[in-house]
Amino acid sequence: MLLGACFIMALIFGVGSVQAEAVLPNNFQTTHPLLLDFNIIDAKFNQNGLKILEFGGGHRSGFTGHDNLYWHGYTWHRFWECAAQFGLPMWYIRQPRDEQRKAFIATDTFLKHAGRFAENEHDLLAQISVQHQPVADGSFPDYKGIILINKTNKEYFPMYTFLKSKLPQATFVCETANHFVFDKYRTDVLFREPGLKQYRPKCMVCYKRYRKSLAKKIIGRMKCDMFVIKPLNAQYGKGIIFVTKEDLDSTLKTILVDKQTPQRILLSEALEWWSHDPNGRFIVEEYVPSTPVEVEGKLFDATLRVIFAMHLQDGQPHVTVFGAFWKLPTHAINDDVSLNQIHQSYQYDRAVMSAPLDDESLVRLQVLLQDALPKVYAKMINETNDQRVQGANVSLPGTGLHGSVVASI
């Protein structure tokens, strides 16, 4: 019994990585020794399997729901422990000013592994130059280190591009997966392969042109009773609308035609996004329920958040899962409120925001993640337009790199 329990805990919380059947060209590893991404996924999870909804960047995420199950800073502690295995110098651009933020990013663990803070790009290069000699243009062409900088922040992006030119062999965290974060279309394309399709809900990408036949076509092709309408690039649950097939036509008309006059007050916040959404298309997914989660004597349709790192080393993609937890909506399944209030989990006006995933489900989740994520990471590397991996090609035996195309209508 004890041996079995130890095996389960090792599988759930072990730092060991998962290898995919994916091989890079021999010359890739000599030029690009290490890629490292810190990510989250939101997913629906039930007895039938796992449906991945979207990717997010771990360095940009709040982990209150996960840390509450352990301790403040636990999630970042796991990331630094993972990054330390490579034996490279670790850098974090701009030291947090307040104590709460320092605790959140597990500063003690970072410093324990000889991590160092730098205020900006010039401070970082100055610190590196203490032990390494730059070449004539001020760059360090052979320097290998792990650098975490939030390049999605407008203030930090110039620092990132400058450092990329001066440290061509450095590993910038989230450089690969960041191209797919909060991009629902690109995420969906990743899964259009045999062996990966089962990890995504059925969906359609539609042009923002309302016509009476649109709802009928969506219902006819997807054959669902309930749908989730989403903007392609909105973040943090903005603009998401849950709707039954009976209300699909009227809802499409509201968001595509009557943008300024929300018809249903309970959806007004979601509808507001559509009045200024810049995309010419949107995505419609089948609604997939999670296994009901009991909290405080009530059942909830929660969304599963998984936190993990992916890295490429020696021509192989690896995945390290840090944990998973349920994100709760504001209302229980049987409450007499709107569909959004019952099913949308990006809500912060509840005293209880999260719930743990039971051990048996965690083991089953790990098996599914071991199958899906390394293959997805290999595809990310292939399809990213990042200059670090231009020309690289990850081969996935048994699958093509160009899968079936979901119809746009």
Regions found by a protein language model. Name each.
Residues 1-20:
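Classical Sec-dependent N-terminal signal peptides that target proteins to the secretory pathway
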Residues 23-30, 56-91, 108, 339-409:
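C-terminal active-site "lid" helix and adjoining low-complexity regulatory extension at the edge
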Residues 32-39, 44-50, 244-348:
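Phosphate-binding site of ATP-dependent enzymes
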Residues 40-47, 56-59, 96-97, 134-136, ...:
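Short, flexible loop/turn elements at secondary-structure junctions
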Residues 51-56, 228-229:
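Short hydrophobic beta-strand that contains or immediately precedes a catalytic carboxylate
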Residues 60-64, 156-159, 237-239, 251, ...:
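Short helix/loop capping segments that flank catalytic or ligand/cofactor-binding pockets
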Residues 70, 98-223, 235:
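Conserved N-proximal alpha/beta basic substrate-recognition cap immediately N-terminal to
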Residues 187, 201-205, 226-266:
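Glycine-rich phosphate-binding loop of ATP-grasp-fold ATP-dependent ligases
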